[in-house]
Amino acid sequence: MHMNDKLMRGYFMAPLKFKDLVAEDNMSEREGSFGFKSKIWLYGVNSPEKLAKNFNKYDGFEIDVVYNEKERTFFVGRGSGKVTLDDMFAVKPDLSGKFFWLDVKNIDFNNQSEILRELIALTGRNIMHKSHLVVVSPNAEYLDDFAASGFLTCFRFPSLYRVKRGDIRKVLEAAVEKYKNSTVDFICGDVRYFNFMDFYFPGAPKMYQNTGREAKNINPYILKRSDTSVVLNQEP
C-alpha cells in the first residue's frame, strides 16, 4: 500500500512534523467575529430548489461556481450547469442574515479583476452585503483585492491524497507561504486534513468540509474549538 493511502484512511491523521517548517505567529492574529450565528452550514447547495428547501434551516450555504467570461455570468456547479447565481439568490426576496460560501473554481491571474467586478455588481442587484459572501480559492494570491473590497475570503488547503510522499513537504511549504503572504480571512479544507491544518496553521480561523459518514461523531469535537468558524455538513 502506498504511504499516502495509509495516511489518508483516517479523518484525524498525524501530521508530518517537518522540523524546519514553522508556522508564523501572525497566523493567530486573523481572528474576529464574522457575524456567524451558527457554525454549521449546508454543503453542496447547487440548485434553487435545494436552497429554498433549506433556507430557514441553516445560516450558510456552500455553492460551487464557475465564472463564464464570455457571458460574464456565474454559473452554479462545476461547469456544465445553466443555473446562475442570480437564479439562486432569487429564491427569496430577503437574503439578509444568510451567508454563502462560493467555491469559485476558476479564479486566475487573468480573470480575477473581472470576477471581482461582477461579484460586486451581483451583490448590488440582489441587495446583499459583500461580507456575507465567502470567496474560496486555492489561489490565495488572487484573493487580496476581494478582501479589500469587503468580501470574506478563504484559502483552500491543498488536497494531499494523490501527492507523492516525497512532495508533501514542498506542497505544505508552498501552502504556508501562500497564507502568510495573503490577507485571506480563513483557511478551509476537508476535515480529513484536520491535523495538518491544525499543526501548520495554528490559530488561523478555519472552515471544514465534513461530508463523510463520521460527521455526527466528529462535529462535537471540531465545533467547540475556538479556531473553527464553519463546518459544512451534507443534508441529513
Question: Where are each of the predicted segments found?
Answer:
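Phosphate-group recognition and catalysis centered on beta-loop-alpha active-site segments
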Residues: 1-236
